[in-house]
């Protein structure tokens, strides 16, 4: 298991279990804050496109491994902290985040 440090402002993919109908490619988003043992991850909702935040463990897995850890999730109950891979082919460009953030700031 690779143990790399997260960078604030960098895009990653969070892999969840259960996936709630989302693909195993993970949810693309950006780390907005680092806590002692976790990071705050911001992502766009697939329903409506508004920004949401989740707090996940500071655990980065190599992108080559992709989605894994379902058995561990079931055993530990930590279904929302399976792992995070670096987003190398992110579908939402950073400008999309800026656009949504701008709308939130202006109250739209």
Predicted features, each with a name:
Residues 25-34:
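Short beta-strand-centered aromatic/proline hotspots
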Residues 8, 33-36:
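Short, solvent-exposed coil/turn segments at beta-strand boundaries
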Residues 39-43:
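SH3/SH3-like beta-barrel fold
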Residues 47-108:
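Intrinsically disordered, low-complexity, charged/polar segments
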Residues 22-24, 53:
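Short solvent-exposed loop/turn micro-motifs enriched in small/polar/acidic residues
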Residues 3-22:
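Short coil-to-beta transition motif at edge beta-strands of beta-rich domains
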Residues 17, 44, 85:
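Surface loops and adjacent helix of pleckstrin homology
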Residues 1-8, 104-108:
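Short intrinsically disordered terminal tails
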């Amino acid at each position: 298991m690779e143990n790399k440090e997260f960078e604030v402002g960098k895009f990653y993919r969070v892999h969840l279990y259960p996936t709630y109908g989302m693909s195993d490619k993970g949810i693309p988003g950006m780390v907005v804050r680092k806590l002692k043992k976790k990071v705050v991850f911001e992502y766009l909702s697939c329903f409506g496109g508004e920004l949401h935040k989740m707090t996940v463990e500071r655990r980065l897995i190599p992108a080559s491994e992709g989605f894994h850890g379902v058995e561990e999730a079931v055993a530990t109950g930590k279904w929302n902290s399976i792992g995070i891979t670096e987003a190398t082919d992110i579908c939402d460009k950073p400008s999309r985040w800026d656009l949504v953030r701008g709308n939130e700031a202006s109250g739209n």
